[in-house]
Amino acid sequence: MTIHEFGQNHDEVVVLVHPSATMWDYFEYVIPLMQDRYHLIVPALPGYDTETGSDFTSVPEIAEKLANWLIAHGHREIACIYGCSMGGAVVTRFLADRKVKAQSAVIDGGITPYQLPWIVTRLIAVKDFLLISMGKLGGLKILQKAFSTDEYSEEDLQYIVKVLKHMSAKTIWRTFESCNNYAMPKPVVVDCDCIEYWYAKAEEKDRKSDIAYIKKNLPQTLFKVFGHVGHGGLAALKPDLLAEELTRVMGRDKRDETGTNANSDFRN
């Protein structure tokens, strides 16, 4: 897992964890907007790291390695950790491990463990594996049918094609199997009071079980709904909004942190 750093001269540390089917440069439009104010730490996760050629391992292992890296480099407390989709799963487990104190955290469309029978979760993993494998083999034509072309340019889709070609079959399988079924401590106890779960209005139905899981296990979480963007679309399509919202989250005062609960949401 290669770690990329920007704005190292700043004290406030912000960790950005990318989703699946992307690489660390998923944040290429966000980094220039934040590196003049924050020390940004952007890991290239196993299986999506062109510098190591490794396969994806698991959500718990990646969360642990990320925390260990932060501790080894003197970051026992950070201003914020943000993760999208698969990255949101890593953030969820990272918070539960409580190795590093995060003053704030954002789980953007994050995947939580399925609360379903074992055989059902495996069938879902097989379906997801086959869909991504088809995209890997079918290339741009398949992706143009799968994604809304009025949101993503051909250049954006070519980027996804490049990432899919890099992903091994083992990485594809482990990504879905682990993101859908990763273990969490029981009970879930975190030491971060300022947590937000973000999701797009268009994916509200798809995130229903994830939202329910977060409400049950992280009751201090505030929910924010975004319109005019799809799952994981903020970094690529609205980087200014993402940077602005992360800055807002880090600026929430103690009164706001304790006064808003999981039954609340606000819309953008």
Where do the protein language model's features map onto the residues?
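Gly/Ala-rich beta-loop-alpha elbow adjacent to hydrolase catalytic centers
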Residues: 83-91
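Flexible "cap/lid" loop of the alpha/beta hydrolase fold
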Residues: 96, 102-132
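Active-site loop/oxyanion-hole signature of alpha/beta-hydrolase fold enzymes
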Residues: 41-80
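Catalytic histidine-centered segment of alpha/beta-hydrolase-like enzymes
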Residues: 226-241
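Acidic catalytic loop of the alpha/beta-hydrolase fold
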Residues: 201-206, 232
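Conserved alpha/beta-hydrolase catalytic His-Asp/Glu region
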Residues: 116-117, 136-189
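Short beta-strand/loop motif that positions the catalytic acidic residue
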Residues: 191, 196-199
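Conserved HGGG/HGGXW glycine-rich cap/lid loop of the alpha/beta-hydrolase fold
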Residues: 4-52
